[in-house]
């Protein structure tokens, strides 16, 4: 399957940049692995650049294997409407702009609806609004919630939720700047 195709491409002399768009598209599919797939894809390029081509094959094999086995987060209740929102991207578009303040206090479904409604806005404006909302949530974070382990998983919030959001946002910006048609998935 995927590993065989990768090995074939590598044996033909293809390198990471030749695979990067397909890997990015795969990483963004279904909000795979809560965004970790995209983070790993963006960091693979950095590692290969810093450590040299000798690490490319084992790194690509590991990355592709992780993409094949990635969990589809669009199947869990909190993110179930993600696929529908992507399918409808560009259909609504009745807002020309969105800000971080517009997103404050929203749940996942409300945020999906709002970003879908604002799909005509410049993508970097949508990105900045989502990143800004994450930053505002971080500033207003109450440690009380982190210590409430008796609550349902969706109500457990810790510092990892914020730092992961920032790391994922950075990966989205890096990869979607290279491949702009993938911004809606990011």
What are the residue ranges of the model-derived segments?
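Mature, well-folded catalytic/scaffold domains that follow N-terminal targeting or propeptide regions
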Residues: 1-186
């Amino acid at each position: 399957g995927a590993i065989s195709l990768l090995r074939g491409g590598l044996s033909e002399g293809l390198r990471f940049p030749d695979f990067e768009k397909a890997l990015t598209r795969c990483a963004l599919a279904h909000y795979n692995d809560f965004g970790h797939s995209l983070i790993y894809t963006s960091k693979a390029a950095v590692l290969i650049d810093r450590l040299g081509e000798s690490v490319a094959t084992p790194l690509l094999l590991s990355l592709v294997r992780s993409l094949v086995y990635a969990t589809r987060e669009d199947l869990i209740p909190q993110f179930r409407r993600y696929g529908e929102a992507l399918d409808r991207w560009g259909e609504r578009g009745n807002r020309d702009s969105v800000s971080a303040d517009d997103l404050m206090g929203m749940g996942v479904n409300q945020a999906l609806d709002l970003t879908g409604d604002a799909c005509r806005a410049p993508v970097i404006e949508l990105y900045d609004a989502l990143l800004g909302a994450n930053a505002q949530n971080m500033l207003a974070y109450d440690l009380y919630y982190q210590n409430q382990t008796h609550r349902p998983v969706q109500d457990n919030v810790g510092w990892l939720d914020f730092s992961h959001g920032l790391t994922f946002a950075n990966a989205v910006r890096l990869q979607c700047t290279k491949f702009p048609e993938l911004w809606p998935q990011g």
